[in-house]
Amino acid sequence: MPAGGAMRIDLSELPIDGTDNLFLDIQVKTIEKYNLLESDFEVAHQQFVLQEKINFTDRIDSSEEITLLEDEELLTVRSAKQKFIFNKSNGNLSRWLDEKGNEKLLHELSEQFTRAPLDNDIGVSEVEHIDSNAWLERWKAVGFYELKTLLKNMIIQATENEVIISVQTDYEAKGKIAFSTIREYHIFRNGELLLKVDFKRNIEFPEPARIGLCLQLAEKAENVTYFGLGPDENYPDRRGASLFGQWNLRITDMTTPYIFPSENGLRMETRELNYGRLKVRAMGQSFAFNLSPYSQNQLAKKGHWHLLEEEAGTWLNIDGFHMGVGGDDSWSPSVAQEYLLTKGNYHYEVSFKLT
């Protein structure tokens, strides 16, 4: 097809019935070698979403009983021969035992609002010449990296088919409330944990880097499968080359080894994630995630990638929302307004289940 030309291609009849995801992928490739471009070299691509699969989850059809045990420190829910153990001092899921009694978590499921700083977050700051406008300096100045968790309320409801645990938490930064959340855990008879999160931020503070969750899984699998944007890392303002798809990748492909360790490897618009026995599903809007042998804490502290040390299990970060990375000019806090988390209220939902 010549430059500026047009072509019509009629597609065969497609099953538009809601039972499958349908995408139309178009690639523009060179027919033959042209200057520096080899033949069959992709010069452009575009993806069109024709249909998204409609998913329903049957949580009631289970013969398993669901029981509740409570003492002064812990709340234990037994469902589908598994145990979900909550820490009553902070409302976090602190332990998850499978049907054989194997521990699935090495670090509790907690909320997370910061990221290991990117070069762009640091900007032109130096030890002796701090740039107060840099995102990292703004987050540090208000205390986002030293948040104090204040449990306000924890309410438990039990029915025949589920246990609902509602946790209200304030996150204090240098004596002021920066964030408030209500986490609603729904544990069903089939062993599924649905987590609904309502988030509110103090708009006097800078916008956070992310609004999400963090947990350290005991499992260390070789591969990960997910349905979302890929195959490479992508962020709100760095996703133009990514495509929706069912991606099956090695866990080593999920990190990007930047010379200076930082937040990396995010995959956005994820509907479903499968890693080892764990299945994570988006309920409503999609989520973003990254999987790594390195915690955000270690990434933030080490100065070079080769200094990183693999940790036990696998760190999983799940974000309902994540700000852009900026870097339009490579040295200033240039994240566009549309990619900042400026709203006062956010909501997201994800479900966790062992397969």
Locations of the language-model features?
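Beta-strand/loop-rich accessory regions of lumenal/periplasmic or secreted enzymes
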Residues: 14-19, 48-355
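Beta-sandwich strand segments
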Residues: 34-43, 329-330
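Intrinsically disordered, low-complexity Pro/Gly/Ser/Thr-rich segments with frequent PxxP/GP/PP motifs
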Residues: 1-31
